[in-house]
Amino acid sequence: MKTLAGLVLGLVIFDAAVTAPTLESINYDSETYDATLEDLDNLYNYENIPVDKVEIEIATVMPSGNRELLTPPPQPEKAQEEEEEEESTPRLIDGSSPQEPEFTGVLGPHTNEDFPTCLLCTCISTTVYCDDHELDAIPPLPKNTAYFYSRFNRIKKINKNDFASLSDLKRIDLTSNLISEIDEDAFRKLPQLRELVLRDNKIRQLPELPTTLTFIDISNNRLGRKGIKQEAFKDMYDLHHLYLTDNNLDHIPLPLPENLRALHLQNNNILEMHEDTFCNVKNLTYIRKALEDIRLDGNPINLSKTPQAYMCLPRLPVGSLV
């Protein structure tokens, strides 16, 4: 039985082997291989291979229905020109144009060089500081200026129109300039002026001053015999401090206001003093309580020669007694 089964299995295997196709031998020799090494890179280049599929262009299509173009209406030519001009015009900090003739914003009016004063100087509220800017003239000031400082410059003259429209001006300080000339009406029409400082200049003559002044300092100038008008300080009822140090004065300017507290005249050329310079010779009980600070040192005057001139004073003047 086993012999018969083995015979059948052998016949099946032999039949399968006879019916199988014969395989040709494949030669991989380099001589029969057509592709060169230089063309190996092109075997994987798919850029130029045509694609059978149809290319689809992607675009945005307006929805069906109302497909009117949504373009804005053209602006009139004049309006466009104005808009272009407005965009091309530079603007300053406060929004105004630098080409405007009048500059009333926070930067103040324009100087003679067409430059805003408050860019050249420093403006804080109603105070304008123009110190040490090599100015040779007083710049145009904002109309609300109350305190003006222009020290250590090269200003040579004060014109009558420099402060003409500044009705709120209370203090002017022009220390250390080159001022030698002041127009007669430069200060007279300033209704609120309280303090005037012109020390360290070349002033030879004072103009008429407003009677509202409480503080005057014109030290270290060139005021001489005719440098101060007669009775220049008579009606200044609120004048408290008068500093005329380091000038060429040969007399004390009289009469002095009743409320004067300090009078500095040191380093002048004062030679004499009268008994009624400070006191009232007709009223021996008169006492001048306010005037406590008188400086006459540095003058050729001998204070011991006029003892009656100080009887009404709370303190003796400072000066030479020999």
Curated annotation (Swiss-Prot):
GO terms for molecular function: glycosaminoglycan binding. This is Epiphycan. Keywords: Disulfide bond, Extracellular matrix, Glycoprotein, Leucine-rich repeat, Proteoglycan, Repeat, Secreted, Signal. Residues 106-143 form the LRRNT domain. InterPro entries: Leu-rich_rpt, Leu-rich_rpt_typical-subtyp, LRR_dom_sf, LRRNT, Mimecan/Epiphycan/Opticin. It comes from the Eukaryota. It holds the Pfam family LRR_8. Residues 64-101 are annotated as: Disordered. May have a role in bone formation and also in establishing the ordered structure of cartilage through matrix organization. The O-linked polysaccharides on Thr-60 and Ser-96 are probably the mucin type linked to GalNAc. There is one glycosaminoglycan chain, known to be dermatan sulfate, and it is probably the O-glycosylation at Ser-64. Cartilage, ligament, and placenta. Disulfide bonds join C118-C130, C279-C312. One of its GO terms (cellular component) is extracellular matrix. Belongs to the small leucine-rich proteoglycan (SLRP) family. SLRP class III subfamily. The gene is EPYC. It is found in: Secreted, Extracellular space, Extracellular matrix. GO terms for biological process: articular cartilage development; bone development; female pregnancy; sensory perception of sound. PANTHER family: EPIPHYCAN, EPIPHYCAN-RELATED. Residues 1-19 form the signal peptide. It comes from Homo sapiens. LRR repeats lie at residues 144-165, 168-189, 192-213, 238-258, 259-280, 290-310. Its main location: secreted. Glycans are attached at T60, S64, S96, N283, N302.
